[in-house]
Every structure is written in C-alpha cells, then in structure tokens.
Amino acid sequence: MLDGFTRHGLFDLSVRVHGDLQVDDHHTIEDTGIVLGTALKEAIGDKKGIKRYGSCILPMDESLVLCAIDLSGRPYFVWDAEFTTDRIGDMSTEMVKEFFYAISYACGMNLHIRVLAGGNNHHVAEAMFKSFAKALDAATSYDPRITDVLSTKGLSLIHI
C-alpha cells in the first residue's frame, strides 16, 4: 500500500520498520503512520507557497474512494468506510483506519476519507492509499501566485 502511495503521489519514501508483528500488526502500522505523518509535517515546513488543499476521487475497478486534505495544522480525521473482511493479506482491515488517523494527527492535517462505492476490500484499501497520495500531492504543490501561507487567519474584513 505504501508503494502505491509513493508512486501515485510522486513521493520519495524509504521505510524500514521493526515491530512486534509476532503479537499483532497494531503497533507496527500505527507507529509507521505516526512516523510518516511527522516526516510529512517536517518536509512540508512553513507551508509558504503551497496550495494547502487537495482532493481526489479515485476509481479502482468497482471501488470509488474520495480523499480530501487541508494542511491547516489542525488535525481532524473523518472516516466513512467499512470493510467486509477482517484482513487484507496479512494486514488487519481495522488498521487501515488507524494508519490514516495516525498520519492525520502527527502531520496536523484535516483528512477525510470516504468510500463512495466498494466491493473488493483490497481494491477499496488500495484506492484509499492512492487517492490519499494524489490529494497530498495536490495539497503540497507549489503555486507561484501564493507568496505566503494560504490562510485568512489574522486578516480583517473590510466592508465597502
């Protein structure tokens, strides 16, 4: 799933994880999300010049997933998805949600993931990772018209 994230988001990522998989996958996957979210926050930096918002609706065969991101610095996570099996390969399906929650809070992003159509659980999960990648790529893209942080906080409204 992380390979799909890096390829479709056009990100360079190398991950080496040592976990307690002999117990279960919870800590390993959650900690990977925390570390990735922290690394993203650090890589994004002061956010000057980036678009801040990104979204993607991505089809994967019968599945359709929406992902929307706001790199506001205020973590918030909305999940509207259900899996019909307990596992996808060696991964607990409940850990997909925990992974994205961990990234969201560690990075300080507002993250919404919603399954619009589903079927095959692997396709749904893969579409989640790829739509997240494309939304994050859009949100972190530079725009020469944005000369500072894209925000209206601290601005006074002038009524004419």
Per-region residue spans from a language model:
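Polyanion/phosphate-binding surface patch
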Residues: 2-19, 26-29
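Intrinsic, low-complexity N-terminal interaction/targeting segments
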Residues: 3-5, 48-107
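Flexible, glycine/charged-enriched surface loops at secondary-structure junctions
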Residues: 12, 46-53, 110-114, 139-151
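A short glycine/serine-rich beta->alpha loop
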Residues: 18-26, 116-122
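Ordered, amphipathic secondary-structure segments that act as subunit-interaction surfaces
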Residues: 30-51
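Mixed-charge, glycine-accented linear interaction segment located at domain edges/termini
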Residues: 74-78, 88-143
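Conserved small/polar residues in nucleotide/adenosyl-binding loops
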Residues: 158-160
